[in-house]
Amino acid sequence: MSRQAIDRREFLTLPLALLLWPRARAHATAVAHTAPYRVDVSLLYGALNYRLEEIFAESVDKSGGRYEVAVTGEGDGISNRIESAGTLRQGRWAPLRTQSFFSVKGRESRSTVTYDYAARQVDYRFKGETFFLRRLRVVEDVVPMPEGVRIDDAISATLNYADQLWPAEPDGSLTTHIVRRKISSNEGPDDVQARYQAELAPFKLSVAVDAESRKPIGRFDLTRFSSWARQSQPAQITFGADRRPEQMNLPMILGTSVQIRLKTA
């Protein structure tokens, strides 16, 4: 079996994938929605398999200009917890703070991202282990917010797409920036370094209607977010009539894949 390691923050970009899903928590004046879903992870040509049963809880208060999201999930040897909050700012949803915790076979990772629009900066903190060799990656950095640059996290991007608050570029694509750990172009899954920085990574979503299903399908490049991704195999999101994700497929290197789908039964 290959001993190449998986970074916990990047565990097949599972945090990113999980945050791109519909969820809801009750709020006094907000529109609330809850949705169960399932994550199936297959590693190294099926040598390792994980299933994660999740509940997303989302509360969106458009009149008050706030949203809150809570995500909890549990599976055999795998669990996660995500809490996120944001605000309606300059006509679009913008993140304020996101905290996440993930554990896979005892390997834990924690991250906190805080957005300060008055100071025009993002505080990014992460600590996690690689999957097999348990090598540590730590990021404590502050990233400036340049004027005129669109910034999201996965939650705000999902809400902006659903509410049609994400304007398209001339070529029809949807672009924004997401704060994450800076990855070198030749980084391998087990590579670590003494000091890490955070960065505003460009995120581009190309959406087209599928000829067979007639549903919108979005594709995006994961290589800026995971050393297990490759440009020749973009991630794919299938959207429903409400412009929310129904299914996600994340093909990776070394016979690895992540599939996320709503539970209909």
Feature map (PLM): residue ranges:
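Structured domain cores in non-transmembrane regions
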Residues: 98, 105-140
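N-terminal secretory signal peptides
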Residues: 1-21
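Intrinsically disordered, low-complexity regions of eukaryotic proteins
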Residues: 9-12, 118, 125, 155
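Acidic, serine/threonine-rich low-complexity disordered tracts
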Residues: 27-117, 165-265
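A charged, solvent-exposed segment within the mature domains of Sec-exported extracytoplasmic proteins
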Residues: 124-185
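Compositionally biased, intrinsically disordered/low-complexity regions enriched for serine, proline
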Residues: 12, 19, 141-143, 248
